[in-house]
Amino acid sequence: VGFKAGVKEYKLNYYTPDYDTKDTDILAAFRVSPQPGVPPEEAGAAVAAESSTGTWTTVWTDGLTSLDRYKGRCYEIEPVAGEENQFIAYVAYPLDLFEEGSVTNMLTSIVGNVFGFKALRALRLEDLRIPPAYTKTFQGPPHGIQVERDKLNKYGRPLLGCTIKPKLGLSAKNYGRAVYECLRGGLDFTKDDENVNSQPFMRWRDRFLFCAEALFKAQAETGEIKGHYLNATAGTCEEMIKRAVFARELGVPIVMHDYLTGGFTANTSLAHYCRDNGLLLHIHRAMHAVIDRQKNHGMHFRVLAKALRMSGGDHIHAGTVVGKLEGEREITLGFVDLLRDDFVEKDRSRGIYFTQDWVSLPGVLPVASGGIHVWHMPALTEIFGDDSVLQFGGGTLGHPWGNAPGAVANRVALEACVKARNEGRDLAREGNEIIREASKWSPELAAACEVWKEIKFEFQAMDTL
């Protein structure tokens, strides 16, 4: 058969409903909204083609390779319940399409040009199944949950953090003072805000020095290991590594990176540096909502979370379920499990489209942060469990008596919740009662309870199934 020029329907080559997926395939679940008149099979096949080997017309050079070996295949299509003209298209990609150890390359293929494709009104990547054969080519998180606990010598409870506010405008010395007060009051960590890099009012080196001094002083006075997430995010990879090197020279335990604005290549480089040099790595997800908030277009956060676990990070922000930022409970717990656990079963009620086996890739601690305060502590302890970081920015620094009492209030509330849970009490039902009891012997907690007793952020969640 000679070369036949011309345009062929995608589904003739790329829609293969009888295909049996291989253990080594990367599987993707796309939410497809075809243009009027485009059948779902053609839309699904087009996604498979455009994100793998296909282009809009037959090309002569197709004959020089084995398309059957390399093409993506749309192997199943199902309508989305309750939505008109929306389908979930399942696509299988052969492993050989991807460079080993490169999240950048994986995403460039799977969520690259295809998202601008005219035959689709909208396209959203809901989930990815990463096969062990591919997972094994990644280092993953620099240390993981168990190693972090051993480094910090903290067990049996969530960790407590606080983002230093106002996020922009403080001088380095005043910033360091706030860090010291929070850590001295009983928090485990304080945090640079995601947009604190190296601005005219506070250059990075000055901030690093004052924060290091603050945390060593707090450490000496409390006998607990303390950390401050020093944001190493910078305009170039070289500058980022330079900042991480300086943090290591100061002897601090943890640095931080904005992985989406910084990019996966930079993030993976930093994760490798952190493992080689014993630094923990805190990841902030600034820009995620640009990608994941639209229900029918973009990428779900669970995909960004999986990508981060492969690229590397020891903590990542993951919504609160109860605060001011997005997060529906079951869906949030779904990707929290994908971050922490070795093996997660497929469970569509939690938005998990595929069984995910991480083999021996270390886990990532989910960070709950954004509009939370002492009254949320029982719910957060119950929802996230011990392996999490609970971060109270305004909920610490907004305390009427100042930063250190704000930290005391949060620590007392947390210890009370953990104690109550260990005694078998039901945090969901008795939460308010537990906090009230604890506030009787902690004036700091009592003052915090009074300030925030009426504050709620009640809006309809966008991230529904």
Curated annotation (Swiss-Prot):
SUPFAM superfamilies: RuBisCo, C-terminal domain, RuBisCO, large subunit, small (N-terminal) domain. One of its GO terms (molecular function) is ribulose-bisphosphate carboxylase activity. Substrate binds at N113, T163, K167, R285, H317, S369. The active site is at K165 (proton acceptor), H284 (proton acceptor). GO terms for biological process: photorespiration; reductive pentose-phosphate cycle. It is found in: Plastid, Chloroplast. Its EC number is 4.1.1.39. Heterohexadecamer of 8 large chains and 8 small chains; disulfide-linked. The disulfide link is formed within the large subunit homodimers. Belongs to the RuBisCO large chain family. Type I subfamily. This is Ribulose bisphosphate carboxylase large chain. It comes from Ilex crenata. The lineage of its organism: Eukaryota, Viridiplantae, Streptophyta, Embryophyta, Tracheophyta.
